[in-house]
Amino acid sequence: IVRLSQPLAEGADADAVTRLGAGGQAANVAAWVAELGGEARFVGKTADDEAGRTARAAFERYGVEVRGPVVAGRTGTVVSLVGVDGGRTMASDRGVSPDFRADELDPAWLDGCTHLHLSGYSLMRSPIDGAALRAAELAPRLSVDLSSWSAIRDFGPERFRERLEALRPAIVFANEDEERILGGPLAGTEWVLKRGPLGARFGDRELPAVAADVVDTTGAGDALAAGYLVGGPEPALEAAARCVAQLGSMP
């Protein structure tokens, strides 16, 4: 995470505060669920490199179980550029993460699972989409975060909507740009609309954001999702406020 103290200018130097740590959408949700008193397990593909070891050590600190292949290569890495106003832009190197195949998924990794939360990214890349769809078949309840309007655009909004409709998730988390490009909420699904500083809409119930001094918005939506899964709307907004008041996406 690079928190800029001044705007970037081409060819110039800008003061910044940097932090290296674990993150990623599914990883953030798992860490926040554990922080908020729930039990969490992360299932994903990582590499036997420094970034992978950092991520696995972070999960251990939070009490999150980790399952999934550990292979040669690069663990997924993201550079989050945080502007002076706390808004963020990301540059992502997915590494080995999208290479997680369905035949590598051990059904035992979902034993005891009462709820599966999928990152939308995992449904828009191959072969990880096969692993995600297989995991969804094994889970009794499913939620999906739409993840990124630009990823939906590149994948194809109609194609992505059809995939979601086939999955029939109990809950979908989206921001306004993602909702717009998808063409609106899915019928028969609990829809949580993340509205940043305006708060969130939980179905037909709209609540304001919890006041916070914004340092970094990276991971705020993931904290909100975790809070909602653990305790509902109020814990969701409280977790998001905690997240934006710190540098970094995990608790």
Give the location of each predicted region.
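Glycine-rich phosphate/adenosyl-contacting loop at the front of the ribokinase-like
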Residues: 1-43, 50-57, 61, 78, ...
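Generic secondary-structure signature for well-ordered alpha-helical cores
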Residues: 2, 6, 35, 64, ...
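Conserved phosphate-binding/catalytic region of the ribokinase-like
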Residues: 14-15, 181-251
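Active-site-adjacent beta-strand anchor residues
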Residues: 23, 41-45, 172-173, 193-194
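Short, conserved phosphate/pyrophosphate- and ester-handling motifs at nucleotide-, phospho-/glycolipid
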Residues: 33, 175, 221
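Ribokinase/PfkB-type carbohydrate-kinase core domain
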Residues: 57-70, 82-205
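Short acidic/glycine-enriched loop/turn segments that link adjacent beta-strands
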Residues: 73-76
